[in-house]
Design a protein with these regions (language model features):
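Residue-level signal for inorganic ion chemistry
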Residues: 26, 79, 118, 178, ...
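Phosphate/ribose-recognition catalytic cores of enzymes acting on nucleotide-derived substrates
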Residues: 195-308
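Short acidic-hydrophobic, aromatic-tinged amphipathic segments that line or gate anion-handling sites
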Residues: 2-8, 67, 88
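N-terminal catalytic cores of NTP/NDP-binding nucleotidyl/phosphoryl-transfer enzymes
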Residues: 9-71
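Glycine-rich, Lys/Arg-enriched anion-binding loops that position phosphate/diphosphate groups
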Residues: 141-240
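N-terminal Rossmann-like or analogous alpha/beta NTP/dinucleotide-binding catalytic cores
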Residues: 58-144
Length: 308
């Protein structure tokens, strides 16, 4: 996949393209992209996904804090895995947001990006205030010799697959269901920072994680079985998200992972965790001994899950 930021490099090319934010690059997105590749192959033209590095709502509303499934780099990696020819990166600006659908199709898709065929997601709308629909897009495309077609709808069972639904699953700790819809386990990347070192005193040393991407969604509170990627190696991990009620941590939410069968100083290292299964919710224990007993059970559960 060739990532295109300078659209001048597309001169002389004709493309079969689709457009969207593609957060998560989930099953629904992959279904659309598969159809895109089929249309492109039939036309004998390269396939292209047009996307944005920033969430459009974050540009339009300064106080909006998106909760995303992917950083931009992760999104590019997952798009590349689909086998498309080009990923065209457009900066979503206020000026771009003010273009009507007709202006966008004419000046951006046709004149600037040389789109021959535009495949539209079955429920996708674009242009200022999303005022127009598919029928209007077809008319605007015909005026500049562009074919506009609507993609088939994809559903998983009776439910449509959406980034919003996957975010909801993660917030509800349903990481296995989220992984199925994403086609990969959800992950977080961050730096290991110094904590209170309470876990070490309890016999469960933990690495406290400061997530690199502030807009990425944090799954719901609880204990998880996770895969840990550190210094080129993969480990089993027991990860906790919460405010440590037994230790009176206030309202501060922490992410800390106990790496099974590992010892060593790893502060300031980069770490990635991928969520495999939710083990339990948060519990406030009356004593530290009760907490330690539960952590021993949790570690056995995590080890079994990650060994299966």
């Amino acid at each position: 996949m060739i990532v295109v930021r300078d659209t001048e490099t597309l001169k002389g090319k004709r493309l079969v393209a689709t457009i969207g934010f593609f957060d998560g690059v989930h099953l629904g997105h992959r279904f659309l992209i598969h159809e895109l590749k089929q249309v492109a192959e039939a036309a004998g033209l390269p396939s292209a996904v047009i996307t944005f590095p920033e969430h459009p709502r974050a540009v339009l509303h300064a106080d909006y804090q998106p909760k995303l499934l992917n950083s931009f780099e992760e999104k590019l990696k997952h798009l590349a895995s689909t086998g498309i020819d080009y990923c065209i990166v457009l900066d979503f600006t206020l000026e771009l947001s003010r273009l009507t659908a007709k202006e966008f199709i004419t000046t951006v898709l046709a004149d600037r990006l040389h789109v021959d065929t535009l495949l539209i997601g079955y429920d996708h709308r674009f242009g200022y205030n999303r005022e127009d629909g598919f029928e209007q897009y077809v008319t605007y495309g015909e005026a500049c010799d562009m074919r506009v077609i609507k993609a088939s709808q994809y559903s998983e069972g009776e439910a449509a697959v959406s980034s919003s639904e996957i975010r909801k699953l993660l917030a509800e700790c349903r990481v296995e269901e989220a992984a199925h819809l994403l086609t990969y386990p959800y992950g977080l990347k961050g730096s290991i920072v110094s904590g209170y070192k309470v876990g070490r005193k309890l016999g469960f040393p933990t690495a406290n994680i400061q997530v690199d991407e502030p807009f990425k969604i944090i799954p719901g509170i609880g204990v998880y079985a996770v895969r840990v990627y550190l210094n080129g190696q993969r480990y089993k991990g027991m990860l906790y998200i919460g405010n440590r009620p037994t230790l009176d941590n206030g309202d501060n939410i922490t992410l800390e992972v106990n790496i099974l069968n590992f010892s060593g100083n790893i502060y300031n290292n980069e770490i990635t965790v991928t969520f495999i299964q939710h083990v339990r919710g948060d519990i406030k224990f009356d004593t530290l001994d009760q907490l330690i007993d539960q952590l021993k059970k949790d570690r056995e559960t995590v080890d079994r899950i990650l060994t299966e």
